[in-house]
Amino acid sequence: MTLVSFFTYTARTLSKERKEGSLAFWHSMPISDSKAIAVKLVFALVIIPIIASFLLLFADLTVWFVGQWFVPQSLLTDYSVNLVALGQHYGEFISTMAAMSLALLPVACIIFFISQFNEHPLITIFVIILLIKIMGSIVFNSTVIGDWISQVNNLSINILMSDHPWGTLMAIGSPTLMGLLIIAVTFFVLTVRFRAGK
């Protein structure tokens, strides 16, 4: 749910501004383009996961509450359905979301940039990735570039599925993490400049 909401929001929020004409309104307000983009990033990478965590907490508490009334205590103990386990589960989810949000930062910046001049940024990114993989394989006669792109592309999913999300994030290596940070900053700046009409 978090990933679906993330991709839906990032793909539509900036293009929606241009379609509805609200961009001119926001430019008339005392809010810089960099702050506006930063707020959208915070919503995509922080607020959406927090909302998802509240839904998870509500579901866990509902299971616990129903269990107290209708399930034998011995069965609840066997399946670790108690407040301590629920708290631990919630904490693990928050930790996973934090690691995943860091992995999604460059993705969000790239989507924001492409979505300003393309109505289907996700399809565009998919095609670009496919072309890079094919060209890398043809030109260099190697799948190294394609393998690296796949590793980065699947990072958020791997983190989500991992029992050790931070270990999965760090496992891609410091050079790759630094490269992703540079990509994020570069596309953030490009997005701000494009939104400002520069």
Predicted regions and their residues:
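Terminal transmembrane helical anchor/hairpin motif
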Residues: 75-198
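Transmembrane helix boundary and interhelical loop/hinge segments in multi-pass membrane proteins
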Residues: 7-27, 41
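Residue-level signal for alpha-helical transmembrane segments in multi-pass membrane proteins
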Residues: 5-12, 57, 61-62, 136-139, ...
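Secretory targeting signals
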Residues: 1-8, 39-116
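Perimembrane helix-loop junctions in membrane proteins
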Residues: 13-16, 20, 63, 67, ...
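Short helix-to-coil transition segments within interhelical loops
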Residues: 28-32
